[in-house]
Amino acid sequence: EAKDASVTVVNNNVNIVPEQQGISIDKATLEQIIKELQNSEDTVRQLPVQFTQPKVLSRDIQSKLFKDTLASFSTVFDTSNENNANRGENIRLASQKINGKILAPGETFSFNEVVGPRTVESGYKAAHAYSNGEVVDEVGGGVCQVSSTLYNAVLRADLKVTERVNHMFTVGYVELGMDATVSYGGVDFKFVNNTEWPIKIEGWVSPDNQLTFRLIGTNTNPGKTVHFYSPGATVIECPVEYIDDPSLPSGQIDVLKEGAPGYSVDTYKIVKQDGVVVSEEKLSTSYYQPMKRVIRRGIG
């Protein structure tokens, strides 16, 4: 039986397994030849060998492997102060871990598994991050921009997302409902290469602080496009906490924390084939908590 050429991914290396020609023998004809040889002095016969050709050849795979950009997405960040510069370094380190990763068909990508622990020993720095309802300095702060940027590229390539959680509070580098938070040992971002070909992830940071992920594979349906929209977010007003201070004159107020509203947003995915809508589905509901506004008021 003929065997088609195939492709495997081992230790992030792509291997093409060559095709094999199929060989078989017509049993009925062979039995007839054997009978004839038993009753004949002629001992030379041509065996009834049949050859079958594989449908997929090595050169076919080689010509299609990593030839198309399935999707790309970029976000930007600022490095104008120490905190943001630290964020930028964390973003650069995490994107380098992902750059060049190759996924076999059916393979699952785990952000935490690929990027690994975000530690000082690995070069990560302390920067602002969300933790337990507060903005705190955390080693690896900013890495969620990497996972969110990759999430957007993955969505546009129409790959299957199996684990994604939005941030506790809103973020400024992607639209509402389009972020993906991560925490090593906790929340992860995962997706599956649900195509029939290997996919290579390219990720880099440009000199002007733009983070880009590009997914390279084989586009077997160039007429398909994927779009996303949110019909509108429900605004959740931020709670206000007052701290009475007798040392301040009555009526005087001092805003200690500005606070921010929360949001609930539904995100939908539309798939078009040659410009015609073929499917529409709800992708996710993302809930962002409001940040408490804290005001000190004088009662003296």
Predicted regions located by residue number:
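Well-ordered beta-sheet/strand-loop patches within structured domains
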Residues: 1-300
